[in-house]
């Protein structure tokens, strides 16, 4: 992130004018590295300090902490709330113009679910959630675009909102109890800068649920965009979504260093003038994935290969005449 900051051309955007903070959510793998641990004590008592520690990757979905054993009611999303409030405090940061929460991969998953159930903080400074290349998303409806019967847990939290409290959640429980319409309304009220690496076709799903929304990160992203389209009703307002398509693999450094990354993380609204860059990355992939279109590029054609092949076939972005069908020629077309 700091290396990316150093690449910004505007010399006013630097380490003296931009505060960068990376929160640390330790888990059991961090014993005696992130927090002290004493072997031989009763189960759950080995962590002997007030350090907040989470179970596995549950921090990424807002679950309560696992340690210390006598205080286990702190959600990782409460931590994000407090960080936002801290940087929004004008007595500490009188010149704060914008707050960006940035998450790549599992961090992106964290922020997408935070967008869905996160509290309305009523900040003075605009807040943007930069969400990039998550492996799965919490769906805002009971519908899934792909096969559901083979996955009875498809709608459990973190991919849906069933079994929410059972996951270890107290944060957002009252909102989730109101139902999906309330969750979606809360999600839609958040300002999200989506970032998608177009070379990222990875899949690290550990359950069947993500596969009901696509076979890999690429499919899952575009299915989510199709069903829950971002919007930018007022580019100078505080609820304008953007979607940036970046020619990169699953690499946070390349995402941060891209022109899109530099804009969303550092230069958008830097001077408090409500300015923001248009969506990056043309041609676009599907209808609805361009909430803040660049008027000079919006009509960029998708097909760049104009050759005619055997049988009069022309290239339209993917081959769909393969037999038998392969992963490169899916029966369900996304875009």
Q: Which residues fall in each region the model found?
A:
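Phosphate/oxyanion-binding active-site loops and adjacent basic polyanion-contact surfaces
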Residues: 69-81, 216-221, 254-262
């Amino acid at each position: 992130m700091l290396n990316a900051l150093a690449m910004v051309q505007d010399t006013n955007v630097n380490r003296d004018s931009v505060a960068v903070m990376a929160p640390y959510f330790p888990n059991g793998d961090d014993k005696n590295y992130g927090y002290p641990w004493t072997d031989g004590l009763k189960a759950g008592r080995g962590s002997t300090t007030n350090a907040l520690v989470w179970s596995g990757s549950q921090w990424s979905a807002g679950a309560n902490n696992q340690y210390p054993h006598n205080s286990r009611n702190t959600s990782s999303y409460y931590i994000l709330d407090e960080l936002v409030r801290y940087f929004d405090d004008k007595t500490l940061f009188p010149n704060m113009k914008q707050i960006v929460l940035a998450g790549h991969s599992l961090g992106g998953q964290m922020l997408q679910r935070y967008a869905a159930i996160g509290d309305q903080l009523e900040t003075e400074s605009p807040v943007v959630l930069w969400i990039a290349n998550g492996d799965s998303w919490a769906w805002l409806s009971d519908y899934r675009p792909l096969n559901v019967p083979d996955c009875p847990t498809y709608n459990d939290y973190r991919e849906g909102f069933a079994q929410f409290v059972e996951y270890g959640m107290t944060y957002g429980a009252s909102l989730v109890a109101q139902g999906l319409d309330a969750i979606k309304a809360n999600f839609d009220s958040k300002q999200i800068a989506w970032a998608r690496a177009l070379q990222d076709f990875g899949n690290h799903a550990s359950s069947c649920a993500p596969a009901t929304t696509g076979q890999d990160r690429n499919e899952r992203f575009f299915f989510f965009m199709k069903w829950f389209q971002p919007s930018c009703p007022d580019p100078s307002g505080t609820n304008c979504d953007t979607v940036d398509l970046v020619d990169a693999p699953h690499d946070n450094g390349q995402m941060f260093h891209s022109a899109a990354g530099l804009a969303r993380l550092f230069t958008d609204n830097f001077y408090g003038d409500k300015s923001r860059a248009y969506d990056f990355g043309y041609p676009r992939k599907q209808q609805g994935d361009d909430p803040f279109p660049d008027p000079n590029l919006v009509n960029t054609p998708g097909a760049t290969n104009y050759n005619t092949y055997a049988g009069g076939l022309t290239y339209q972005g993917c081959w769909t005449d393969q037999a038998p069908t392969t992963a490169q020629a899916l029966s369900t077309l996304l875009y």
